[in-house]
Amino acid sequence: MADVRADARVPAAHASAIGVGRSFKLVLSYDGTDFHGWQVQPAAPTIQGALLEAGRRFLGADVRVTGASRTDAGVHALRQTASLSTSASLDADAVRSALNAALPPAVRVLSAVAAPPGFDARRTALGKRYAYLIDTGAVAAPLWRRIAWHVPVSLDVAAMRTALAALSGRHDFSAFRAAAGSAAPPVCTVQALHVVRRRERLAILVSADRFLHHMVRNIVGSAVEIGRGAQRPEWLGEVLASRDRTQGGPTAPAHGLVLVRVRYPG
């Protein structure tokens, strides 16, 4: 990633627009394959870093960006939400166009609107939806290789649905958090869990008020064990009750995970 110059300036065509600071609500889509996640890291390409570089190039050095979800390396987003603040008083369409002109092709700003008072992409969110994509074909589909986990067996979708039903509602999800997870409270409310099959492709959709680190990927890894026939459907509820990560299945690879949307009031 190119260096972000501290003296970056808005192009002359927009120079007169600098004035009172503004905050924008951005909706982004990205292919996370070649990025080291959302959060800025030294000497590594990240989504937040790409947005900051693009913003500082066209909007000035004081640009700030906050994402609703700090997606991990390799994770994608269909509709991620971010807050962007700047002293450039451009309109929302100009901000979107300026960012897309400077962002790499794997990252696009789908929309930009003036943020309502007090809006913060992360703190204002009421919940998120993720999808995990699985390719069960005997031969991995080349067009899906960057966005789906290849599991070349016929998975028992009915058994997976039965198992996942035990996770709906408010629970302690310690058994599905990263082994070296943070000290964040482990209780989450899962509002919806679905398994959708289209021929050799599966999508596991999970909506919740909040998620623990690796929570979706750990749930999927365990659900696939049930789909393979390696575990009983009842086992998933037992893993949940154990609150012990070592009792669950493997962590599914990052590249099959997609942030579908972020939910806000109104």
Give residue ranges: language-model regions:
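Structured-RNA-binding interfaces characteristic of tRNA pseudouridine synthases
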Residues: 1-266
